[in-house]
Amino acid sequence: MAHKKGVGSSKNGRESESKRLGVKIFGGQAAIAGNIIVRQRGSKHNPGENVYMGKDHTLHARVAGLVKFQKKGENKSYVSVVAFEA
């Protein structure tokens, strides 16, 4: 019996768990207040009207409505929620 581990065994097993990032509610779909619209690292998408950004850069709907994505300028993407009529 070996008194030390095999050489390769301790060098394996570092695969990290996926973080499930990305768009959760797409443009034209309905969101209710508090729904997660985009989970991201950094501000790839910026908050527009009726959207706020959490401390981990996640975008949430502030009100119920339809999600709208739009580009402004070269590479600025904004996500907004168009509120439903009352």
UniProtKB/Swiss-Prot annotation:
Species for this entry: Flavobacterium psychrophilum (strain ATCC 49511 / DSM 21280 / CIP 103535 / JIP02/86)
Domain of life: Bacteria
Entry-linked SUPFAM superfamilies: Ribosomal L27 protein-like
GO MF: structural constituent of ribosome
Protein name per the record: Large ribosomal subunit protein bL27
Annotated family: Belongs to the bacterial ribosomal protein bL27 family.
Matches recorded under InterPro entries: Ribosomal_bL27, Ribosomal_bL27_CS
Keywords attached to this entry: Ribonucleoprotein, Ribosomal protein
GO cellular component term of the entry, any: cytosolic large ribosomal subunit
